[in-house]
Amino acid sequence: MARYTGPVCKLCRREGEKLFLKGSRCVAVKCSFEKKSYAPGQHGVSQRVKLSEYGIQLREKQKVRRIYGILEKQFRNYFAKADQLKGVTGENLLRLLESRLDNTIYRLGFAQSRKQARQLVRHRHFTVNGQLVDIPSFLLKPGDIISVKDKSKKLSVLHDSMRKVRDEDMYPWLKLEKAQIQGTFVDWPNRTDIPIQVQENLIVELYSK
């Protein structure tokens, strides 16, 4: 599947805020957004465009897509599935995105970014309930256990990432067992616990047109 392969810092500049797409680098002084927080392009510095209602909704959708690293067609499929579930469609959408295997690996601290998590999954380093899974978009269910294969437990990228994880910072819908290098998707997250600043209702309005 085709994916964006250009400079990810430009995506943050396009949205006008940090999307934390490069892990620890995003909180370091080397972060490009700190030096160039304006939109990319020749006229980015002086560009001040007042967005229409549609433009605001579109930007919100693009922001969520870029945070989770998802293409448009796949994002539409998630929205369609969220719309069929009971409850608030926008919140259902975020819960589905949070239940992706690559996102959960990132949230557990096994990877420093979702992009790195996708690479680790594709390289067959993880199992779910004891079964090898190499599909980053695999959707987890409450009770699913994510483990690192025995042969992969010495990976330097894994330990470099885990050194920065504190137990008290773990997300309430996840359980991390550092000694076993495994985690559990305990339950669906509450919207208030999902740490991304988006107005998902704008996405619902966009797709409802």
For the regions a language model picked out, list residue spans one by one.
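Short, well-ordered loop/turn sites that connect or cap secondary structure elements
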Residues: L120-V121, L140
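Beta-rich strand-turn-strand
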Residues: A111-R114
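Ferredoxin-like alpha/beta domains used as RNA- or RNAP-binding modules
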Residues: M1-L108, I135-K209
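Glycine- and Gly-Pro-enriched alpha-helical subdomains that act as flexible
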Residues: R124-D134
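Short, intrinsically disordered, mixed-charge
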Residues: R107, R122-H123
